[in-house]
Amino acid sequence: MAKHCPNDDLSKIPDEELVRWSKEDLIRRLRRVDGEKMSLMLEHSNMMKDVNRSLQVHLHEIRNLKEINQKLQDDNQELRELCCFLDDDRQKGKKLSREWQRFGKFTASSVWKEVSTYQQKLKELEINQENVLRENAELKDIILMLDEDRNGAGSRSSIDSQSSLSNLNGGSGTVRDVGDGSSTSSGGSAGSPDHHHNHIHKTVEAKIGTVRRSMDDLSAPHHHRSIPAGLNDASSNYIRQLETKVRILEDNNNKLLSQPCSRYSLSKLSMKYNPGDLRALRKGMTLYHSESQLSSLPQRQEALLNGTGRLQTSESSPSTGFISSAQKPEAVVHAMKVLEVHDNLEKQLPEESEEDLSEKEKAIVREMCNVVWRKLGDATGTKPSLRQQLSGNQFKAPL
């Protein structure tokens, strides 16, 4: 019966049945069960060894993973710190870039403003340069005109003195009427200085007209004169100096003319001075008297021309319309009248061509002019002479 029972199901066999078995069956069955148990224990031990081995492997792997994880965590921390550092640098760079951008915008705007300012200044400087060049050209023209006027005035003085030389050589003591039909030369020769004066009279009159206009402009009031805008300091100072000198000379002349003087009459002047000397005086006096001051002279000239055709030796009456003797010396008044009459008489002379004066004749004419100036200086007494007044450096050019 025991043989028929399964080996692995002994626990299910009841005890009564086991009692019925024989000893041999029981021993055999026990040994078999012990063998099975031993095999099971061996298998279990092997399995435990395998499990332990696998556990050891897993533990080792876990340790390695832990180490790797720790390393990765360390690397991650370093990377995190590096990222924070880089982020700080990025923020700083961004802030710095914004500051540089603002600085660049501000610098660009400032540079553009400065460039526009410098361009405006450059344009102004170009305009000022053009104005200075134009004013320099105008000043050159003025200087050339003043030089020409001064040279023309000197030639007028030399030419007008030739008639005095001819009158002295001819022994004429009085002023001769050039419109009475007689010869215009004392010797009747075509090469005399008086004849030469008739030839160049119109040219000299044109130059003297320019001198009169220039000096009338200089002697005009300050608000009537126009100084070009933008003149440099040297030119404006020079013009102001000229105006100051002209005003000073006008004041001195007015003071001189306000004191009456009756030393010389019209007859003495006409006997003492020949036409060349009186024309030289007229040339000097026109530097300080405008044409409006001589507006009453044509009445006197017309009366003189219609009366006798020659200059009379009588005194001039105060009812002639000219400035009274209480305002000007009689010598200057009579000299101006004689000069105006002679200028009107000389306009009737015919034009003739003659050669220029020789050097000897020019020297004689200059000496006669010096004599006339000395006479005019003696006529004013202790007062400043006309020559000192008229040679007041009013024609000096700016340095």
From Swiss-Prot:
Belongs to the CCDC85 family. It comes from the Eukaryota. This is Coiled-coil domain-containing protein 85C-B. Residues 155-169 have a biased composition (Low complexity). InterPro entries: CCDC85 (IPR019359). The keyword Cell wall biogenesis/degradation does not apply. It comes from Danio rerio (Zebrafish). PANTHER family: COILED-COIL DOMAIN-CONTAINING PROTEIN 85C (PTHR13546:SF14), RE60986P (PTHR13546). It is found in: Cell junction, Tight junction; Cell junction, Adherens junction. Its main location: other. Keywords: Cell junction, Coiled coil, Developmental protein, Tight junction.
